[in-house]
Amino acid sequence: MEPLMSFKQKNDYGLHALVILAQYHNIAVSPEEIKHKFDPEGKGIDLVAWLLAAKSFELKAKKVKKSIDRLPFIHLPALIWRDDGQHFILTKIDTQTNRYLIFDLEERNPKVLSAVEFQQVFQGNVILLTSRASIMGKLAKFDFTWFIPAIIKYRKIFVEVMIVSIFLQLFALITPLFFQVVMDKVLVHRGFSTLNVITVALAIVVIFEIVLSGLRTYVFSHSTSRIDVELGAKLFRHLLALPISYFENRRVGDTVARVRELDQIRNFLTGQALTSVLDLLFSFIFFAVMWYYSPKLTIVILLSLPCYIAWSIFISPILRRRLDEKFTRNADNQAFLVESVTAIDTIKALAVTPQMTNIWDKQLASYVSADFRVTVLATIGQQGVQLIQKTVMIINLWLGAHLVISGDLSIGQLIAFNMLSGQVIAPVIRLAQLWQDFQQVGISITRLGDVLNAPTENFQGKLSLPEINGDVTFKNIRFRYKPDAPIILNDVNLTIKQGEVIGIVGRSGSGKSTLTKLLQRFYIPENGQVLIDGHDLALADPNWLRRQIGVVLQDNVLLNRSIRDNIALTDPSMPMEQVIHAAKLAGAHDFISELREGYNTMVGEQGAGLSGGQRQRIAIARALVNNPRILIFDEATSALDYESEHIIMRNMQQICHGRTVIIIAHRLSTVRKADRIIVMEKGHIVERGKHSELLENKDGLYYYLNQLQSI
């Protein structure tokens, strides 16, 4: 095998590895800052300096010795440290094929190595890396323990609920004693006066029991509803704070299905399961009285409890697997349904309704089948519980009758004992019958945790700088969307001056739109810096940045609100004059004025009530209304008719006045008047200059594209 890396730039490998690993943990690191602090002589970062540098960026780094067979159990990605300086990053291990995915720090590309190849380059030194944020994230992850702080928050209410539960158990204890007195004393001695007293007392106990039970349910439901509101609010805030990459890697329907699992948790919190748990916790009160009546009968009841537990343990793994399958099928249905409704125009235009219906029928059948299997297994579980209950009842009846006949127990005591045992067994049976709900809520918490445990965009500690001027610099940019994905941008250097209008053209997939995503801080480059007014965006607060950049895409989404609300989306209290001014700049005021309700016209879902050109002009007005210093047009006019495009281009000079404008376009006519035109090909800038200058190079890509559009 050839050496993994050459020694050409091995001094930079440790530095580059730290930058990449820090970015993985959403921590912006400046290579120049590391060099200045930890490698001032340029000799390369040694191990001690590397660990200190990591610590300075709130990363917890630890060097350990590991054998190859222990690597699958470590937290990845990790840095494989080599004595010769040829370090590399281990990102993933496929234990089935015994292959290793590494990131080559020389070629700056991922590589897949076999076990033999990996063994040749692995020296046993591993640097494990975690961030304090990730450690805190693990401690604060969403699972059953999330509810503990919520319970502590409402501890006074829950203490009151527990006190009420104790009183309910005491009332439940009194009722069997009354029945015993009636059977053993009143009936034998024909004591009508005693019967009347006991009946009145029993009625009072029943009334108190009903009132307390209703009060407990009300208070408990009220508290759990507040927890439900907090969870729902936290979920939505967290969902909106997730990075763009989270949504790009998941289907919309799958995310919706996970969010809908909140309903399952809500039903669990407000249902009978938790009150049954409380009843079970306080049922120990009955055992002392039951033991007083008959130790033998009490032992039978006690022996039945492990049977319920064993049956639940036996059936739980099977039920959980089937619930998992049911969720997966339901998520597939949700995704397909969302996709079908979103693409309804295409489906009808292509007349593929029968094919889509066929797919839906198959997926629906799979879901119904999975749901049926869950129901069957849950029924088997409930019948097993019933079998144990009936068996215990028969044994107690037989044994109790023997004790009565032998004189060890009175009839009243036997009846009272059975009533007491019923109070003990009832919550156990309810919990066993509700075991499916427990399994379901466990699945729901796991699925919802996929959303709530996903790391959000890191805003803490980021700089909120003054209003930007508009100087933009892309410095040595190298970027890919995933570690094992192809390079999208490679060694891109571009400087845009304040107030300059830049056109960016090139074939599809050349990296044009990716540049603007980096400018909006949706992603952090693998290498290099994106600067605005000399400030590294990796260190800037994304919200501060995005509020000062206006963006118009090819397919803009309007919300189901009025035109005014859509234009003033960032500030609903915005003066109407400011809204109208932006609409005039975008060439939208005239057609809005002709509408029946003007600016109060509802646009429909995703702007369905407007034409494509009208939607685009409203989107431009929305981008302009805050007077951004940087404006991005990403294929903003490519889907417009010529009249709508002409209206926008006519106002372009006024729109661009005093701003830095980046126009990405396939139509070269859109960028002809730009101050400079950047031509991109396969992630590189291959040409730059004015329209007339680029046409002079007849071997250039711009000339070729211009000739194609002139035909």
Curated annotation (Swiss-Prot):
The family database entries (Pfam families) matched by this protein are listed as:
ABC_membrane, ABC_tran, Peptidase_C39
User: What is the top-level taxon of the source organism?
Assistant: Bacteria
Translocase as UniProt keyword:
yes
Q: Which residues bind ATP?
A: 506-513
Query: What biological-process terms (Gene Ontology) are attached?
Result: protein secretion by the type I secretion system; proteolysis
Q: Does the keyword Cell division apply?
A: no
Q: Which reaction does it catalyse?
A: ATP + H2O + proteinSide 1 = ADP + phosphate + proteinSide 2
What sequence ranges are listed for the domain ABC transporter?
A: 472-707
Q: Where is it mostly found?
A: membrane
Q: What is this protein called?
A: Exotoxin translocation ATP-binding protein PaxB
Gene for this chain: paxB
